[in-house]
Amino acid sequence: MRILVVHGPNLNMLGTREPGIYGTLTLDRINESLVALADELGCTISPFQSNSEGALVDAIQAAAGTCDGILINPAAYTHTSVAIRDALAAVALPVVEVHLSNIHRREEFRSHSFVAAVAVGQITGFGADSYLLGLRALFTHIEKGIVTKG
């Protein structure tokens, strides 16, 4: 099983960017933790980060036929990108959306997610553990062969 892990804009700045909100772990450390969990579960991950909406859409589209699911933190694009939402729907893979902070407890504009409508589920507010919980949930969902539509 292969999972695409998509990290949206500004996540390359983790560790130094607003640590009171996003924590002190770097994106590299989060990816290392995801690789370790993937090894434990018996799957592989392909992490991808970009600050560019188009590059994120390209990576999502490339997952069709090569990946079994997508774990995504769309970051700020959560609240603005119909293009990312449509790309996720188009590839028709199971998607789990994750966020480091609880987007529903922050500014009002952050509480709406375009991605949620095409995701199997959303895990938010557990810091870096949101990624690990999301990977475990996505793996289990795929293993059980649950069919979902985005």
UniProtKB/Swiss-Prot annotation:
E.C. no: 4.2.1.10
Transport keyword on record: no
An example Gene Ontology biological process: chorismate biosynthetic process
SUPFAM superfamilies: Type II 3-dehydroquinate dehydratase
Enzyme class at the top of the EC tree: lyase
Residues annotated to bind substrate: 73, 79, 86, 100-101, 110
Gene Ontology MF, one: 3-dehydroquinate dehydratase activity
Keywords for the protein's UniProt record, in alphabetical order: Amino-acid biosynthesis, Aromatic amino acid biosynthesis, Lyase
Active site per the UniProt annotation: 22 (proton acceptor), 99 (proton donor)
Pathway named in the protein's UniProt entry: Metabolic intermediate biosynthesis; chorismate biosynthesis; chorismate from D-erythrose 4-phosphate and phosphoenolpyruvate: step 3/7
Record-linked Pfam families: DHquinase_II (PF01220)
UniProt cross-references to Gene3D superfamilies, sorted A to Z: Dehydroquinase, class II (3.40.50.9100)
Protein name according to UniProt: 3-dehydroquinate dehydratase
Provenance organism: Geobacter sulfurreducens (strain ATCC 51573 / DSM 12127 / PCA)
Gene assigned in the entry: aroQ
